[in-house]
Amino acid sequence: MTQRTSPPFRADHVGSLLRPPAIKTAREQRARKEITDAALRAIEDREIEKAIARQEQIGLQLATDGEFRRSWWHFDFFRGLAGVTFYTTDHGIQFHGVQTKAETIKIDGKIGFSGHPMLDHFKFLKAHARVTPKMTIPAPSTLHFRQGRAAISQQIYPDLDAFFDDLANAYRAAIRAFHDAGCRYLQLDDTAWSMLCDPNERAQSKKRGDDPDSLPARYARLTNAALQAKPADMAITMHSCRGNFRSTFIASGGYDFVAEHLLGYTNFDGYFLEYDSDRAGGFEPLRFFPKGKKQLVLGLVTSKTGALENKDEIKRRIDEATKYVALDQLCLSPQCGFASTEEGNILADEEQWAKLRMIVEIAQEVWGLRKSCPSP
C-alpha cells in the first residue's frame, strides 16, 4: 500500500475540535460586550494556529481550523446564504436525553451564495498550514431535511423543484469561491442520509410534509447538481452523521435504506461513514461502494467518549470491511467531529489528541505508511 498524496488521507479526521478554554471565555466576554470583535478574532487566530501545529505534529496530512470560529457546524454557514433567516425558537433540537440551544433557521427568500465569512476563515487556515488545509461546510441536503417543507416559504417556493435548483446553484457558486480561495479539500457534512436510516426520523419527515421514500433519490440528484462543475484538482468528500451534541445522538439504524443512492449514485471523491457503534449497523451496505478511485473513510474511533479504543480491534474491523471494499480504497477517522457545536463532546482535550494520534499510528501499521512530515 502507498501513502495517499491527495484527500481523503489514510489517517483523516472529520473537522471539529474541542474549543479551547480561551475561546470559550472570549466568546462569553464578547456576548457581554466586554471585548470587541477584533479582540475575539485575535484569540481565535492564536488558538487556531496552535491547533494546526498540533495536527501537523501528530503526523496528519491535513489540518482544519477545528471550526473554532463557529457556534454550530451547520447554521453558521447556512445563515450566510441569501434567503436564509436565523432566529430563536421555543425549543432546541432534541437529542438523546438533551436539547441544543433554541436556535434554528427558515427559508424566506430565494437561496443564493455571493460571498461568505467562511472564505476568510479558510484563507487564514491555508496561510498557516504546512499540510493540506481542509474546509468543512454542511451539505445542501441538510438545509432541506432538518425542517423540511414546513420551513420553506410557500410564497417563495411553491414548487420545491425550484428550491432544489437554487440550492444546487448556490453550492456550485460556493465550491467555485472556495476553490478560488485556494481550497483543494472540501467536505460536505451531512445528517440527512443517516437520519433517513432511522424509522422514527422518516416518520418525522413525513409529518413535516415530505416523502421520505423519495428523498434518497432526490438528495442524490441535488448532490450531483451541486458537484456538477467541481474542479478537477479539488477533492470533495462527505461525512454522514447520526447527530453529535454533548456526546449524544439522534438517530440509529444501518445504511441499508440509503446505501445504493448514497454510495452508488453520488459523485463525491470520498465518504466518511460512522461505524463506532451498533447504531450504525454492519458493513453489508458497503457492497454498493464502487471499485475505482473513490475512498471510503471508516469512522471506527468514537469522538463521543475519551476511552481509547483497542488498536487490534480497530484493525480487525478494517479487515472485516475489506470483504466489501478493497483495502486500498479504505481510510480511517473518528466517527464524527469532537465538537459539532461550541459546547463540545464530553472528553478531555488530551483524550481527543490521543485518539487522533492513535488513528495515525494504526494507519501507519495497516497501510505501511511513513509518518507525514510537513514541508517548511
Protein language model features and the residues they cover:
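Domain-level signal for soluble alpha/beta catalytic cores
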Residues: 1-376
